Amino acid sequence: LYDPSQYELTRNPEAIRKQMTLIDQIHERGAKVIMSSHMSGDFRTAEQVLEHLRQQSARGADILKIVTRANTEDELAEVIRTTMILNKELDKPFVHLCNGSCSRLHRFIGPKLGSAIAFAVNDYNKPSLLYGQPTIRSLKTVIEAIPWHVDDVQVK
């Protein structure tokens, strides 16, 4: 079932079959499945992320999750564009996050762009906590302060 692979998404047919069988068994018990890939060290284009999440969906996952990287302003702009494309193209809930030196803004606005889940910490009083995640209080403040959601945009 476990098949370590680049970008945390196996292409091994036997491993894929086992994943799909397990997902079916989980669904039979009435539960939902989130499939998650972390490639925090790599920048991925919108097209690469969309294809990756479509593969997760094809395996039966109910919620699709991916974490990529944003270390430059251009990468951040592409991450924002990617989240909006995912919101338009996918028919399942998704979580699109990024890590990196330019990732913090996306952590705050991801839910406004269509990401189903945001991650936050209570506070930064422990040295082990990553500062990439906002605090619950600051995330809530930002989300409540922006009276906009991508689903409210009417394309002409």
Question: What function would you assign to each model-found segment?
Answer:
Residues 2-156:
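Catalytic alpha/beta core domains of metabolic enzymes, predominantly
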